[in-house]
A protein has these predicted regions:
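Histidine-dependent nucleotide/RNA phosphoesterase domain, centered on the 2H-phosphoesterase fold
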Residues: 1-127
Length: 127
């Protein structure tokens, strides 16, 4: 399987979360926005992201323009929550009250069904 092969060829990725963002309301979801943390775009992490998504998108279509590298404009992000627009102030206050702008490490890739049920975990090796 291609995910296992990808993991064997790549190592864990260090990253830092440097900002918060919102993905705008769209289609039938006009009353909500997606609240995200954004990693700093360090080249090793961006290269890892693109390498994974190029392979992933050859198998899975319709992942959305905010994640797709095939459209060459992904918004690299970590989703925190889907928030009602009227509750954004409270959500942002919660984010800023916690230590979310920190270092992190991608240690594995996981495949899920929707709703969130783990199918398989692929651990990345240390660099």
């Amino acid at each position: 399987d291609w995910t296992g092969e990808f993991v064997r060829e790549h190592t864990r990725q260090k990253l830092a979360f440097g900002s918060v963002s919102l993905l705008p309301p769209y289609a039938t979801h006009r009353e909500t926005a997606v609240l995200c943390l954004n990693p700093v775009h360090a080249k090793p992490f961006v290269d890892f992201y693109y390498a994974f998504h190029e392979k992933y998108e050859s198998f899975c279509k319709g992942i959305g323009s905010f994640s797709a590298v095939s459209e060459d404009k992904p918004v690299i992000h970590c989703t925190l929550s889907v928030v009602r627009i009227t509750e954004l102030q409270d959500a942002l206050e919660l984010v800023f009250q916690n230590d979310v702008f920190t270092q992190a490490e991608v240690t594995a890739l996981e495949i899920y069904t929707y709703p969130m049920r783990l199918i398989k975990r692929f651990d990345l090796t240390r660099a």
